[in-house]
């Protein structure tokens, strides 16, 4: 199929929409382009565009690719804005606008330090995750913000990201091959464990400190209220 490329200043709705709404605007602009009512237009086969993108990624390592529809459909903050882009490594997708610059507060658990006598210590993971979440939440309050837009976003949504390091060290200490099914199983189970305790800690902090300004109406509230 053929894709039509537009200049962003002529199609402002495409930046702020996704899914069926985006599709409706896109087809309208395509019709306007066929009528000669758009100033800057380029037609290109989707296969050729994809090949060009993948070739650049292979040759240079950039651009990293993520997809707008899934990012917004799965966004827990879909009620307060649109996800326009991601962080460099595409692990963070937050909504932003002229009034808010998306900011995320990041930390990591070191799996190597969570290994006790060759075993992954789930109790240590639980307590460390809780401590890490509290520290990340505290960072929001004491951090330096270069712009008011960044501060406004951070205080309204209080986003945090908790990842890991030392994964391969843990596999080595458990005598698990990196490319084995057992390694995949450990990755799934360990991250599910971290996710559980991170969400549990977050909900406990909400009782202690109050929910975020934008919790009401979010996916979190919609899930927990049913």
Named regions from a protein language model:
Residues 22, 36, 140, 156, ...:
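N-proximal short alpha-helices
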Residues 1-111, 115-122, 145-151, 198, ...:
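Active-site cavity-forming subdomains of large catalytic enzyme subunits
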Residues 101-107, 131-134, 165:
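Short coil-to-beta-strand
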Residues 65, 111, 165, 170, ...:
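Short, electropositive, low-hydrophobicity segments enriched in small/polar residues
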Residues 108, 137, 158-173:
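Contiguous, well-ordered alpha-helical segments that form the cores/surfaces of helical PPI scaffolds
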Residues 69, 169-171, 183:
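Ubiquitous "structural anchor" signal
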Residues 128-151, 155, 159, 176-226:
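Internal maturation/activation junctions in enzymes
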């Amino acid at each position: 199929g053929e894709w039509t490329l537009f200049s962003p200043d002529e199609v402002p709705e495409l930046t702020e929409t996704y899914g069926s709404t985006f599709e409706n605007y896109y087809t309208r602009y395509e019709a306007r382009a066929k009528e000669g009512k758009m100033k800057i237009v380029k037609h290109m086969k989707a296969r050729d565009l994809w090949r060009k993108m993948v070739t650049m990624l292979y040759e240079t390592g950039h651009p990293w690719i993520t997809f707008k529809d899934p990012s917004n459909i799965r966004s827990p903050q879909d009620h307060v804005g649109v996800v326009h882009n991601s962080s460099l490594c595409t692990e963070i997708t937050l909504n932003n606008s002229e009034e808010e610059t998306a900011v995320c507060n990041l930390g990591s658990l070191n799996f190597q330090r969570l290994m006790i006598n060759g075993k992954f210590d789930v109790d240590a993971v639980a307590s460390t995750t809780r401590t890490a979440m509290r520290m990340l939440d505290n960072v929001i309050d004491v951090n330096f913000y270069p712009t008011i837009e960044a501060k406004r976003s951070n205080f309204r949504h209080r986003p945090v990201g908790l990842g890991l390091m030392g994964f391969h060290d843990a596999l080595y200490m458990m005598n698990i091959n990196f490319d084995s099914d057992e390694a995949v199983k450990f990755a799934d189970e360990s991250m599910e464990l971290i996710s559980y305790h991170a969400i549990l800690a977050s909900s406990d902090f909400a009782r202690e400190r109050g929910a975020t300004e934008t919790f009401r109406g979010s996916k979190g509230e919609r899930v927990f209220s049913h």
